[in-house]
Amino acid sequence: MNNLKRFTKSIFSCIALSGLLFLGGCETLPPMTDLSPITVDNAAQAKAWELQGKLAIRTPEDKLSANLYWRHSEERDELTLTTMLGTTVLTLEATPNSAHLHIDGKDFRDTNAQALLERVSGWSIPINDLPLWITGQIGSLDRVIAVDSAGQAKQLQNMQTPPPWLVTFLSWQSQSGAKVPYQLTLERGDLQLKLQLNQWQALGKPSILLGEKP
């Protein structure tokens, strides 16, 4: 059994134990202890954020859906996938120099989160670029190939590693004062990821609330 099948089988087993496969309600994760909710003019101003939403992964062999919780800052990322009943099926904690993945009672470590996920799952998921795309931003290696009627990026290709990732922004919303995607898809070969952001909250240091810029 290859890495991808082992990975999805482990997640499906955890979800099956909870008695439910698809997406459902969300529980609120506690905020980062040193950060507070802020309002920003655009997503690029938010050096930290947290989101609650849904993630669906599709391959020719498997379909996986889960609730997604992600807390991001320049110093660390904390990502959790859960079932509707709140059962945690995967956690990923990462800093610029380390990554820890916990799934199905097993722990995996590496110096890079993207490399760790690829080693364990077989998926080359662009964890390093996702914070930009989730907030509707364009990276230095991204090429915009379609725009909407307002001139905003609708589709882009990431040219970092061939074959390129194709990112499509399906819909947008206003959260924390900024315009961010509501739904987007990432496609590369026969792997497709679909994300839905039910809640996105910009975070900043407490001093920001007193008038400093984030």
UniProtKB/Swiss-Prot annotation:
Q: Which family does it belong to?
A: Belongs to the LolB family.
Q: Which PROSITE patterns match?
A: PROKAR_LIPOPROTEIN (PS51257)
Bilayer topology annotation: Lipid-anchor
Q: How does it assemble?
A: Monomer.
Q: Where in the cell is it found?
A: Cell outer membrane
Gene Ontology cellular component list? cell outer membrane
Per the record, the major location class is membrane
Q: Which UniProt keywords apply?
A: Cell outer membrane, Chaperone, Lipoprotein, Membrane, Palmitate, Protein transport, Signal, Transport
Signal peptide interval: 1-25
Q: Which HAMAP family match?
A: LolB (MF_00233)
Lipidated residue numbers (N-palmitoyl cysteine): C26
Task: Outline what the protein does.
Answer: Plays a critical role in the incorporation of lipoproteins in the outer membrane after they are released by the LolA protein.
Instruction: Enumerate the InterPro entries for this protein.
Output: LolA/LolB/LppX (IPR029046), OM_lipoprot_LolB (IPR004565)
Protein name according to UniProt: Outer-membrane lipoprotein LolB
One GO BP annotation here? lipoprotein localization to outer membrane
Q: Which Gene3D superfamilies match?
A: Lipoprotein localisation LolA/LolB/LppX
- Output the CDD domains linked to this UniProt entry: LolB (cd16326)
Lipid-modified sites (S-diacylglycerol cysteine) = C26
